[in-house]
Amino acid sequence: MHRWSRLFVPTLREAPSDAEVASHKFLLRSGYIRQLGAGIYSYLLFGQRSINKIVGIVREEMDKIGQEFLLPAIHPADLWRESGRWTVMGDNMFRLKDRKGAELCLGMTHEEVMTDIARNELRSYKQLPQIWYQIQNKFRDEPRPRSGLLRVRQFLMKDSYSFDLNQAGLDKSYDLHDAAYRAIFTRCGLNFVVVEADSGAMGGSGSQEFMVYTDAGEDLIASCAKCGYAANMEKATSKLAPVEELAATGDGQPELISTPGQAAIADICKFLGMQPHSDIKCVAYMAEVPSEDGKTSTWEPVAAFLRGDHFVNETKLLAVVGATELRPMQAEELEKWMHGPAGYLGPVGLTPAKKLRDGSLNVVLDLGLEGRRNLVAGANKLDYHYRNVTPGRDFTWTVAADIRNAAEGEGCPVCGEPLKVAKAVEIGHIFKLGTKYTESMGARVLDENGKEVMPVMGCYGIGIERILTASIEQNNDANGFWLPRSIAPFDVVVTITNMADETLRQAGEALAAQLEAAGYDVLLDDREERAGVKFKDADLVGIPYRFNVGKKTLEGKTELVTRATASSQDVALDAAVEALKALTA
């Protein structure tokens, strides 16, 4: 058993002013963590005990399907150049040089390192499949660290990598991870949902995220209550309801009209008496496109066109264009590529690239504009718009694709029922990478026929601290939070209300010893503090059960409190262990 009087648990009555989300506030107030710098945290006793329990669960489930490794946190730049990601990762990667000038980085992820082991050690199909995992610190140069442990610069991850002979083998490894993740998050007591996701810089095809709904989340999830469809907003699609088209004016051809001072969509809609869905919105970007070898990159112009009531999904647009970063066009770039000022941009008269990334203007049309007619668009001229604009007749594009955010109330892409959109935090992610890394890094094995083939890869990640954070977000009230027994720093706290009373002290000591003998992880609150202080601390720090050893103990009873429900029951001292077993069975 642990004695609170001997522990360092620096609880706070008030959260620091810069703590915004509930989990951040309570992690600080409960003494789980302390901040060292922006996005950099120290884990104190209670925090580390919870992290250790989470790691234990993850390790138990991963050992059922894979083998644990531990890889370096410092990587040579050349390894990342081989995969092409030295450029792709941009400013998110911590980069450094050693005293000899060799370029290095702090690992954000370990696909390259694992693939390097595979290409040097795997020779035959007989050595496949392989699943290798590690639990290791990762580093990311977050531009705006925030929300406590949700957006940090150093974080603990379980990352695993599978190597299979073919796609069928990858599917099996992927399914093994899916089952393992469900077991892990269930054992950690989380209410989670599995959603379709974008692969991003990881590459590959299939991708799913494991998400926990919370207002502190930075992701948006679109879901359907009827059929179960769920997807991250970066991936979500929807069915659009038909909209009424504007009547054509004049001869029905594009008509240049004066619209002085009507740069905003809301203004032009009011000025012309129309709805935003009849406007063509233009969002102009410069996109950073990496070279094939990943060593260099160029900036290419992109004009995205979509309905005036829709919003660009930049993740989708990046994927369509094959870029790593987007930034808005500056005034001189607008003049060069769009031949007009912001607020009056439109597609009529533009010369789109014949194919993506050929150095000319990449015009991307959202699918929501296909088949529309008699729309209003900027004329690429200050204070002027066109009306009667019909896509395909009056302008062309380089590529048409889904580049918009799905919105609440739009139709589910599977069954058509209205979608719901809610915030969530990602706790795990699984990817089917394919041969992206084995091809670029030259990993080969001989198949059954003696032919060289590239192993097919998957990668799979779990954010360890995010499990703790998500649990606190799901389980808190005004007084603090409670954790599931499986990941709480202690299973139960025995609170002696008056240490000056020898009878109570002995009863508390005896009860704590009995609970420990029964297999519980016990904290004995033997501090020389008022009972009220002890109760407040116990409510704050996440321990799921509490025995109060107080006045009723003189009658042979103790009060058993369940933190999650704030319910209590009086039980006989000699039946206390059995009472707790009944609650934790």
Swiss-Prot record:
Which InterPro entries does the record match to this protein?
aa-tRNA-synt_IIb, aa-tRNA-synth_II, aa-tRNA-synth_II/BPL/LPL, Anticodon-bd, Anticodon-bd_dom_sf, Pro-tRNA-ligase_IIa, Pro-tRNA-synth_IIa_bac-type, Pro-tRNA-Synthase_IIa_type1
Q: Which residues form the signal peptide?
A: none
User: In which family does this protein belong, per the annotation?
Assistant: Belongs to the class-II aminoacyl-tRNA synthetase family. ProS type 1 subfamily.
Instruction: Write the Enzyme Commission number(s) for this entry.
Output: 6.1.1.15
The reactions it catalyses are: tRNA(Pro) + L-proline + ATP = L-prolyl-tRNA(Pro) + AMP + diphosphate
Please give the HAMAP family that the UniProt record associates with this protein. Pro_tRNA_synth_type1
Q: What class of enzyme is it?
A: ligase
Where is it localised? Answer: Cytoplasm
What is the documented function of this protein? Catalyzes the attachment of proline to tRNA(Pro) in a two-step reaction: proline is first activated by ATP to form Pro-AMP and then transferred to the acceptor end of tRNA(Pro). As ProRS can inadvertently accommodate and process non-cognate amino acids such as alanine and cysteine, to avoid such errors it has two additional distinct editing activities against alanine. One activity is designated as 'pretransfer' editing and involves the tRNA(Pro)-independent hydrolysis of activated Ala-AMP.
GO BP annotations of the record are: prolyl-tRNA aminoacylation
Q: Gene of origin?
A: proS
Assembly and interaction partners: Homodimer.
Q: Which organism is it from?
A: Acidobacterium capsulatum (strain ATCC 51196 / DSM 11244 / BCRC 80197 / JCM 7670 / NBRC 15755 / NCIMB 13165 / 161)
Please give one Gene Ontology molecular function term for this protein: ATP binding
Principal place of residence: cytoplasm
Keywords, comma-separated and alphabetical: Aminoacyl-tRNA synthetase, ATP-binding, Cytoplasm, Ligase, Nucleotide-binding, Protein biosynthesis
Q: Domain comment, in the record's words?
A: Consists of three domains: the N-terminal catalytic domain, the editing domain and the C-terminal anticodon-binding domain.
Q: What is this protein called?
A: Proline--tRNA ligase
| One GO cellular component term noted in the UniProt record for this chain | cytosol
